Amino acid sequence: MISLRNVHKSFGEKKVLQGFSLEVPEGEAMVIIGYSGSGKSVAIKHIVGLLEPDEGTVFVDGLEVPRLSRRELYELRSKIGYVFQFAALFDSLSIGENVAMGLRKQGLLDAPGINARVAEALDLVDLPNVEDRFPAELSGGMRKRVGLARAIALRPKYLLYDEPTTGLDPVTSAVIDELMIRMREKLGVTSIVITHDMRSAYRVGTRIAMLYEGRVRQCGTVDEIRLSSDPVVRQFVEGKAEIDMDAA
């Protein structure tokens, strides 16, 4: 389980998280929605120890992340796959080399084992036999799938997705959504997905949490969020230009 408890985080005078609390049980696909700059990416960076809270704390599998030693944090990160918004591939490396990076750093497999794991991961994202190609030869959607393959090659327990469908056309976005669902169903991973795309949120989420003014405004099932009576939540999910601030 992942648990963020009353997390506060500021950057200078800017308060980003102000009592953010969220629990993600094993097997769940939690989608975090919210306006640009609301702190969604900041929140999940606390899970892998890239940021430390000013107040509050974060637990993963019962371990308090801010208190972990460097070695313990490394071990924790080996269980967490992070899929970046823009794939974050190295252009000078082949697709196979990009996917193998984490495996080589981990040092648990020999070369044939790494090659087999890379091929397996690429097959899972429907990109077989692309190991010798380079990122510049692939479309944006294909590069995102390579980023996902790199994350799952380590066989993580958790997957964190940061805006996985940003910049993609609707058809390619639907492909990425189906892959996220596949990762949960086939690999049994617990996932947290950050997105602005409500179609994607409704497709992949088992629960959805809206981050607003530094804390969770509402968290519920897909239907509970879709039919929310909260004016702030409703304005966001329906894409309305204005809300009744008296009601908010």
Q: What are these model-derived regions, one by one?
A:
Residues V48:
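Helix-to-loop junction immediately C-terminal to a conserved catalytic motif
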Residues F134-L138, M142:
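Conserved ABC ATPase signature
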Residues L159-D162:
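Catalytic Walker B motif of ABC-type/P-loop ATPase nucleotide-binding domains
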Residues E213-G214:
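Conserved ABC ATPase "signature" C-loop
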